[in-house]
Amino acid sequence: MVLLVVDTQKLITTTDLYNFNAFENAVKTLIAAARENNVEVIYVRHDDGVGAELTKGTPGFEIYEGFSPWSGEKIFDKTVNSSFKGTGLLEYLKAKNVHTVAVVGLQTDYCIDATIKCGFEHGFKMIVPENANSTFDNAFMIGEQSYKYYNEFMWKGRYAECVSVEETIKRMKG
């Protein structure tokens, strides 16, 4: 198992996210548990390209302080929603013989959704810990509705196993 921390960058990791405090706590808890149990923590950052607010070289591009990578932890950069497309992540995980990926981060309805579905299609067992992904309100639904739609309906039993933080930690321990 690996813990994949997706797009938890300063620009978008804000208190405007749905259920921010629970999200922040869940992600911090899972990162700490992964490290304690020798589960590799891998980060992914999104780059919208030159001139965008979310691009390499801007302050908002860096990982949120509360989730900072340790020296030596892998960081993959992407330019599309899926963490697997053109990043080297797929090849890295296959080379390490990884079968299970626990996914946390942002945003539920964009990069988390794409990463879970693509990971599933690449043959990985995808784990989604409760409250460890979030999103913002949008023109069609509030963040809470997006969160519940994906976590409780779309992914569960189709593309991923949606479990509690405690269950995820139990699995990290083997």
Features from the language model and the residues they span:
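Short coil-to-beta-strand
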Residues: 1-7
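Glycine-rich, proline-tolerant flexible connector loops at the mouths of alpha/beta enzymes
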Residues: 48-52
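A short alpha/beta connector and helix-capping loop motif
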Residues: 16-43, 47
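Short, glycine/acidic-enriched capping/hinge loops at junctions between secondary-structure elements
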Residues: 15-17, 53-55
